[in-house]
A protein has these predicted regions:
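Stable alpha-helical elements in mature extracytoplasmic
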Residues: 316-319, 345, 382
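Active-site and glycan-interaction determinants of carbohydrate-active enzymes
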Residues: 348-365
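Glycine- and small/polar-enriched repetitive beta-structure motifs of secreted/surface proteins
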Residues: 1-291, 295-299
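Active-site-adjacent substrate-recognition loops and nearby beta-strands
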Residues: 300-309, 327-342, 365-367
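Glycine-rich, low-complexity segments
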Residues: 1, 271-276, 283-312, 317, ...
Length: 419
């Protein structure tokens, strides 16, 4: 029905065809089971079968493509041999030529798709610039709009992954999630504006609104929690908790663990160090800022089989006599035991027993490393000092006994002389 609709067809070379509209199915020869509805819809179709094309110029250039559904003005207009596609909306899949198995729903969704296969683009301009990227799912207005060749991506949310061009195997879920990603790959961003400024960063996981917001090129980071990892660029970091790792200005760090916005747990993954209630491990494998306790005593390996160069400890008493015990108050009682404390001055102990003092100098960031004392290591020294003192005491006792015996003998001798 319509002027020159199905003009090239005869009743003997096609079947079950419906052509309605000016020059609809104009060049159809043997294509069967087609429905072309609208001016010039399916105009150049020759042998393509089982197509449904509804709208002005819809599927205009289709020749042999079959099993397509194009609905909307100029939807799938340039498709020639592509098959098993569903394009719904104005200019949806407009430039598709030989793409297969695509679903584009929304005005200009998949507009530039040329030969890419098995994509699902839902939303106005979703996947608009895609030409060869395959196996993508873009859902939301302008989701994946600039994607050209990136493949295996899932972008869900308005403007999610809008600037992605070549990045692949990314999952962006949330409004503007991964907004500026261009070539970054294998990222998972979930939450509004999650990973918003990421451009080339790879293998990141950002979960939570604004998480990893300002990361651009950092790789292998895990930020979980609203605003986690804001203003951070770096690699191999783990931030867990709302606002954890949120910095007021641009910040770069690598290989760090942060749990809780107040640094409840902090780790230096490259140095195998862990700190609690602070973001400074003070060059120690395990550091607690504040009071710590437990239900069982602290155990330290001491098996003889683990040791070498074993020698008795000498001069312990003299070392102990040189130590000066003090009472003191910490300047910062927020992170230290409040009130009066008992201890030593580390710098003084270092002059006497350097083996029990660590610290000093500066860390890789230029921060001062405070001295600390291994108080438990003083125990063997105190034991040996007591033993030395006991030995001296025994010697004095023996000497005293001898003196007492001599005095007693002299007293007897004097008494005999006086008789």
């Amino acid at each position: 029905m319509g002027n020159e609709a199905g003009k090239g067809s005869t009743s003997s070379n096609y079947s079950n065809a419906i052509f309605i509209g000016y020059q609809a199915g104009y060049n159809n020869t043997t294509g069967s089971n087609n429905v072309f509805l609208g001016t010039n819809s399916g105009r150049t179709n020759s042998t393509g079968e089982s197509n449904v094309m509804i709208g002005n110029l819809t599927g205009y250039n289709n020749t042999t493509g079959g099993s397509n559904v194009f609905i909307g003005d100029q939807a799938g207009k340039q498709n020639t041999v592509g098959y098993c596609n569903v394009f719904l909306g104005y200019n949806a899949g407009y430039k598709n030529i030989k793409g297969v198995g695509n679903v584009f729903i929304g005005d200009e969704a998949g507009y530039s798709n040329d030969s890419a296969n098995f994509n699902v683009f839902v939303g106005i301009s979703a996947g608009h610039d895609n030409t060869s990227g395959k196996n993508n799912v873009f859902m939301g207005t302008s989701a994946g709009k600039a994607n050209i060749s990136g493949e295996g991506n899932v972008f869900m949310g308005n403007c999610a992954g809008v600037y992605n061009t070549t990045g692949y195997y990314n999952v962006f879920v949330g409004g503007a999630a991964g907004f500026r990603n261009t070539s970054g790959q294998s990222n998972t961003f979930m939450g509004n504006l999650a990973g918003y400024y990421n451009t080339e960063g790879q293998h990141n996981v950002f979960i939570g609104d604004y998480s990893g917001l300002d990361n651009t090129t950092g790789e292998r980071n895990v930020f979980i929690g609203s605003h986690a990892g804001n203003n951070v660029n770096g690699n191999d970091n783990i931030y867990l908790g709302c606002g954890t790792g949120y910095f007021s200005s641009a910040h770069v760090e690598n290989h760090r663990l942060r749990i809780g916005s107040n640094n409840l747990i902090y780790g230096e993954l490259d140095n195998n160090r862990v700190a609690i209630n602070t973001d400074n491990a003070n060059n120690l494998t395990f550091y607690v800022n504040g009071l710590a306790g437990g239900t069982n005593p602290w155990q330290s390996p001491s098996d003889k089989r683990l040791k070498t160069n074993i020698k008795p400890l000498h001069g312990a008493l003299q070392c102990v006599l040189k130590l000066q015990g003090i009472t003191f108050n910490w300047k910062d009682e927020t992170n230290h035991r409040p009130g009066q404390n008992i201890g030593f001055i580390a710098q003084e102990v270092k002059e006497i027993l350097p083996e029990v003092v660590s610290g000093g100098g500066k860390d890789e960031k230029g921060n001062e490393i405070y001295y600390s004392i291994e108080y438990a290591t003083l125990t063997p020294l105190l034991v040996e000092a007591i033993k030395e003192l006991n030995e001296e005491n025994q010697t004095l006792n023996e000497t005293n006994k001898k003196l007492e015996a001599r005095i007693e003998a002299l007293e007897k001798l004097i008494q005999e002389k006086l008789k």
